Amino acid sequence: MNMHEPLTGLFHSSRLMILNFADIPADTPPVENLQRFFEDCEKRGLNPRLPENRQKFNNHLLERSRVRYLVSRYGEDRKGMLTGSKIASQGRTLHMGVDIFCRDLETVYAPCDAAIVRTGREPGDQGYGYYVVLKPDNLPGIHFFFGQLSKDLPGVGPIKAGQPIARLGDFIHGENGGWSRHLHLQMVKTIPREPDPPAL
């Protein structure tokens, strides 16, 4: 099943850019090319993995591109980008969801009628931070995982399409796991026991 099929209204009328980090031309300016951004930061003695530096990169690309969202591709191999991170040490470099990057701490809405079946937090840096798991009413055996949220999470129970779930978490104090501002969205079939996060 295509992840976007049950989410037909999620990106409707939104201004977005689909990112494929591996295909960004090598001769684009450093601020628009993630690999060259990393190299340029390191030359200047800056840490490109700090979320505040990544957020500056995202904000500039959003402004230059005149879009509201940057959306990563499903199934990306991010080994190069995650070298030395906790995620890489756990073998979690293949990105099994989509990331939706933005400038502000936007509200996340339920894409369909569903039940909130679990909320939680993956502690530490370079994790999912606060998260919510939805069980859609019309998709048996499927759950939606929303990660990188704020600490103000909803309670478990039913939710209608279009109702707010939470807001995006900030990188300040590691609320969202220590990343630039974005939503991690993933479909999962099984939910492991706590405290393991239900996504990869």
Where are these regions (language model features)?
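Zn2+-dependent peptidoglycan hydrolase active-site motif and core
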Residues: 110-150
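Acidic, glycine-rich catalytic/binding loops that coordinate metals and/or anionic ligands
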Residues: 2-41, 157-173, 178-200
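Short, glycine/small-residue-enriched coil/turn segments at secondary-structure junctions
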Residues: 88-124
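Extracellular structured ligand-interaction cores
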Residues: 95-97, 105, 129-131, 143, ...
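Small beta-barrel nucleic-acid-binding modules, principally OB-folds
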Residues: 91-92, 96-100, 145, 189, ...
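Short, well-structured beta-strand-loop connectors
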Residues: 107-118, 155-169
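A residue-level detector for short acidic-glycine micro-motifs
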Residues: 102, 118, 148-151, 170, ...
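Polar/charged, compositionally biased leader and regulatory segments
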Residues: 1-99
